[in-house]
């Protein structure tokens, strides 16, 4: 049994796939969608935030712009560590994505869709 959801990051199943009897070789699949946040970006978020904490660059809150999976990974890690997570994103992102981020405890600041990710990045810089 794991004591933290973070311990399951990266410990995803590996499947052996034989594409066809006519094709030699084997394809191996690592099912990164089985990470707790649903993507390989959980690994990136964990290692980046862990490094920032070890360097003393991150103490109690993080601010970042996101369009999705990396933000979900960051929100997951922050929730597990008790850090505040402020994310900026274009208002055009799906309601499901916004709900998932909020479910992990992230505070969202939505930026105008017309400004795209550039607008979200500028807002994150302003908040940081």
Question: Residue locations for each model-derived region?
Answer:
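PLP-dependent amino-acid enzyme catalytic core
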Residues: 1-128
